[in-house]
Design a protein with these regions (language model features):
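Short C-terminal tail/terminal secondary-structure segment
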Residues: 221, 226-231
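Divalent-metal-activated hydrolytic enzyme cores
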Residues: 217-218
């Protein structure tokens, strides 16, 4: 991808973010934009960084590690947003600053145990808000117990929720439901040292406007910025 094309895509995306924020009286500077770069090259990520995208989301561990090696000179915030295999938690804990796809106490515990000394890992709980059997994520009825038990784990900060809606779910309905759950769960953070509950990660290229208007403060965009995967 040419740098000029990426910069143009980013400019248009920022305009859409600004408009969505204006509609709900939200400050656009409160929105974290994560560039999702699965199948994109390290050179494309470097272009994105130079254009101002400093948070990068990756779905596949080995692909991400290769890119990280090529981009050590950049101060990138790396987010793991894919499905987590138990045998990969050590490498995820060692190499990423954020993990968006925690859906069990077992995974949270492994990430906590395997996080390097002196490092704090930011975790988001993936919520299956529409109860889609084909999607990963914890059911809303189980999330309070998971968060409460995870408060005893060292080396992590529980920052909030990550949402991926099912294809058939109306984003207006799905995201508003998720936002209500997020706000309700904020009460859990009182008196808990490692619960911060300040991050609602929801919204992708096709529906990030609705997500922002429903309360998201972190969006994960790939196609809008980089075009079809691998280009």
């Amino acid at each position: 991808m040419k740098a000029a094309e990426l910069e143009s895509n980013l400019s248009e995306t920022k305009k859409a973010i600004d408009l969505s924020c204006k509609l709900v009286a939200k400050d656009p500077s409160t929105i974290r934009l994560i560039g999702v770069t699965k199948t994109q090259s390290a050179d494309t990520i470097r272009q994105a960084y130079n254009a101002g995208i400093t948070d990068i989301g990756e779905n596949y561990l080995q692909e991400a590690l290769t890119k990280m090696d090529a981009l050590r000179d950049l101060d990138i915030g790396w987010h793991f947003i894919g499905s987590i295999q138990s045998n990969k938690t050590r490498l995820i804990a060692e190499n990423f600053e954020w993990v968006h796809s925690v859906d069990s106490l077992k995974l949270a515990t492994r990430l906590s145990d395997q996080c390097p000394k002196g490092k704090t890992l930011n975790l988001l709980i993936q919520l299956n808000v529409d109860k889609d059997p084909n999607k990963r994520g914890i059911d809303v009825s189980e999330i309070e117990e998971l968060v409460s038990k995870a408060t005893d784990l060292p080396n992590i900060k529980i920052r909030g929720l990550m949402i991926i809606l099912a294809e058939q779910t109306d984003p207006v309905v799905g995201y508003k439901t998720a936002s209500k759950i997020f706000e309700k769960l904020k009460t859990l953070k009182s008196n808990q040292e490692n619960i911060y509950w300040d991050t609602l990660s929801m919204g992708m290229s096709k529906d990030f406007e609705q997500a922002i208007q429903s309360g998201s403060n972190t969006i994960r965009l790939g196609t809008n910025l980089f075009g079809p995967r691998g280009n």
